[in-house]
Every structure is written in structure tokens, then in C-alpha cells.
């Protein structure tokens, strides 16, 4: 039940737990996940990101990350600045999907970012990810901003569409 979900900004210890879980689940992408863990811990320490976690019965079941600085966002022009935040890493453990947990975390995150002075949020999605595009549209990300390419540490290249929404 979503009402029992604890929504919070993650601690460094919680980040390490979540990243180790993701690395263990990653399969053939393991090297990318190891690099992403190191990068995200450093970004957190520098104050460039805010990781938001949904915790149920002591377990991290969903997450999202707010990226606050252009240095940590690929194709950052128009996506992140002093009043615009870039959102990424929307993840929910499979067995908890479709039960309202991520929705509760998302609204917690948006409220927190609004209180921090952000007036717009942006995100990126691969055009082939129709389910994710539908979810993002449901959350109000309907303002098309641009397209671009993003690069994984292993050299994988992704086509990405970027969308925004005003934080009201």
C-alpha cells in the first residue's frame, strides 16, 4: 500500500545499498553500472544531484534523481539551469510497479524541488520506449524540447527525446 511508503532524500549509505542492488541486477551491463555508481556518488558529494528514494518496510523499492547542474547532464542546454531541474533514473523494482509507489515518490520529489525554487523540470526518453513516454506524459511532461544522443560508458549510443513541464 502506497500510504506506507517512506519518501525521502537518500543518504550516502542508502545510495551505496541501492547501487549495489542495481549492479547485482545488471547482467551484461555490469561495467556501466559500476561506473555510474562511482559517478553518482561523486555528483552527490558535490551537491550536483539529489537522489529521492521510496522505502517500504525498510527496503528501497523506487527511486528518481534530480540533476541540478549542467556539468552532470548530457546535452544540458535548455535542460538544466538555476530554475530548471533535469530528472532521471526513474526506477521501481518490478514487483512493486503499478501500485502507486512511484507516483507517491514523484509527487514528493516535485514538491521538494518546487520548495527549493525550481520552476521547471525536464527529462529524456528513448523514442522506442513507448511505455515510459506514456508515463511521462501522464506526469505532465508534454513540452517537447529537443532530440539528442546520449552515450553510455561502454560506448553505447542512444537517441533521446527531451520533454519538460512547468512545476505548479
Predicted regions and their residues:
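Conserved beta-strand in the GNAT
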Residues: 53, 59-70, 74-75, 86, ...
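Conserved GNAT acetyl-CoA-binding A-motif
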Residues: 113-125
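Conserved N-terminal entry element of GNAT/NAT acetyltransferase domains
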Residues: 1-21, 168
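Conserved active-site alpha-helix within GNAT-family acetyltransferase domains
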Residues: 103, 128-145
Amino acid at each position: 500500500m502506497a500510504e506506507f511508503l517512506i519518501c525521502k532524500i537518500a543518504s550516502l549509505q542508502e545510495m551505496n545499498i541501492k547501487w549495489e542492488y542495481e549492479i547485482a541486477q545488471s547482467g551484461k551491463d555490469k561495467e556501466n553500472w559500476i561506473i555510474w555508481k562511482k559517478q553518482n556518488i561523486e555528483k552527490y558529494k558535490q551537491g550536483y544531484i539529489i537522489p529521492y528514494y521510496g522505502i517500504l518496510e525498510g527496503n528501497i523499492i523506487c527511486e528518481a534523481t534530480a540533476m541540478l547542474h549542467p556539468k552532470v547532464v548530457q546535452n544540458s542546454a535548455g535542460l538544466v539551469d538555476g530554475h530548471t531541474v533535469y530528472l532521471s533514473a526513474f526506477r521501481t523494482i518490478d514487483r512493486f510497479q503499478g501500485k502507486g509507489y512511484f507516483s507517491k515518490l514523484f509527487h514528493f520529489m516535485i514538491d521538494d524541488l518546487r520548495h527549493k525554487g525550481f520552476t521547471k523540470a525536464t527529462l529524456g526518453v528513448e523514442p522506442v520506449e513507448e511505455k515510459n513516454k506514456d508515463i511521462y506524459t501522464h506526469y505532465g511532461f508534454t513540452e517537447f524540447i529537443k532530440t539528442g544522443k546520449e552515450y553510455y560508458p561502454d560506448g553505447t549510443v542512444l537517441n533521446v527525446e527531451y520533454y519538460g513541464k512547468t512545476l505548479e
